[in-house]
């Protein structure tokens, strides 16, 4: 019986694909070597310890229907679209070795006619007249008895959108998390016009089989039927939840300020695990009572636009004469924290 396993996802849902990856990783026998090939529609994928409000333009993501997905490995934020091919190599220890999986990807690229090399921060680069250009980035995760290496290859990604979503608004964030290093990148289509996701997957698969001297039939993973993976439903629910994707952010502080016709407002938030641990309001409004009440209501609540808006509007009952001010405040806060 082969020790290899090859899985190919036909889903573009990042939460589905990351849930599949997590389930396979947790449940695979320690003797198995796994290759999982997949890709995501418009998504910003952040590292396990990153702060989405720091890393991403979350407001523009919401406007453009771009998803946020937190992965279980470390590293920085990346934008995925269908111009990316994603790969995951898994193996038990002591056989797990990220240099092996890196070599397999380099061999696949070489077979396609691209000479690339490993570089620095877990990247694969190609030499161009303008200097080294990144075509692949990776991240890793290890437990006591197993490990995985996953990454992306840029085939025909929309690089302008990458800059849109990974450049955050100039907000006054004092984050305790990590801001990603931005890298100079290029698409493989610049080197191999017409290259497709299917061709890249085939090349990686062949290099995987060649390295281990075995072949195995591919398993197609699809959301049309629930994958036969123990605890998949629970894993998918967690992977797609606000609590995981946003709530796992490191502690940070956020200062919002705005001037309205009725006065200036400053809101200071301390946020931990997606919850507001402290809310302070400063204003030169002639009637500060609604804002003072708002600070008390926000304490302990979720740092989510809809929840903040809900708390603002709840004050209309106690302060009906300030309806105009509270509605303006509600709209501003909801937009500012997205």
Swiss-Prot record:
GO cellular component: cytosol
EC numbers on record: 6.3.1.20
Keywords, alphabetical: ATP-binding, Cytoplasm, Ligase, Nucleotide-binding
GO molecular function per UniProt: ATP binding; lipoate-protein ligase activity; lipoyltransferase activity
Domain (BPL/LPL catalytic): residue spans on this chain: 29-216
Biochemical pathway: Protein modification; protein lipoylation via exogenous pathway; protein N(6)-(lipoyl)lysine from lipoate: step 1/2; Protein modification; protein lipoylation via exogenous pathway; protein N(6)-(lipoyl)lysine from lipoate: step 2/2
Quaternary structure and interacting proteins, as annotated: Monomer.
Family: Belongs to the LplA family.
Listed name of the protein: Lipoate-protein ligase A
Source organism: Escherichia coli O139:H28 (strain E24377A / ETEC)
Protein encoded by which gene: lplA
